Amino acid sequence: MFVTFDELPPPQGGALRRITRSLRDKIKPPKPEIQKIEVCGSFFFDVRAYWKDGRLLQAHERSLLTGRRGALAARGLTLPQGFRLAVSEDQVARLRAEVLCNTLLRALQRSALPLYCRRVGLIDPECLYPFLLEKLIKYCPVVLVCTDRPERYAPYAERMLEEYGAPITFTGELPALGGCAALLDLGALPLPSFYPVPVFSMRAEPIEHNLSLVLPHYGLPEADEAIPPGIDRDEFYTALWQLCGVEAVGGLCASSMLCKSRRVTVPQIAAQLSQNQEQVRILE
């Protein structure tokens, strides 16, 4: 469970009414509005209150949902005293990585690539996402990992060999990934050209010299309707996943991704994968 914070809307009506309401609220601010919102079999609390210079009025802090410390605030607002950010940057990054991995696998499954051609490269310089190995190895017979810390991957690689009979190949050189059908780019290394191989990337912007796929759009209809205004989408979904136990979030695929200047769908990416053996560039 977590809490979201946003501002109450400014007074409505004519000029005189707004001035009167504003003066009255300064003398005796209205209490925060607290609403329990049910979503995806769980719930969170949405709090609307008056803020000044991005901070909640001190008189209201004592009336807020004591004991519920994890919170998200709308952009430009500071969390009230006693509350902490509901999710960490690392947790948000993990969800993004999961969505990218799920989307890559969905595209491979929808493509006409035979199983023996499903060779995938995982770029993870700092070894932050070894847990993705099992997802990848279930659908890809060959997984190459480009990392500077292969020793951290060793326990995961050993388990993949024991449970699936699949050896994991490690490299510290990006060009070694050149024969892959698709790449999962979870680092910030400068990439050489892998055209026309789709590169599913955590980066904020596409890499011009690659068939770079970034900014996945994902979601659950029920959750999309429940996101309060101003709340960061990735943080909200991470909180649903990590704090509310909505497991469906961890299995989400992107409905579209940004490729150069336009959005492309999973079927379009799958078609590119299918045609890459003939060097046909569908996503151009």
Annotate each predicted stretch with a short phrase.
Residues 79-84, 129-131, 150-157, 190-192, ...:
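Short, charged/polar "capping" segments at the starts of alpha-helices
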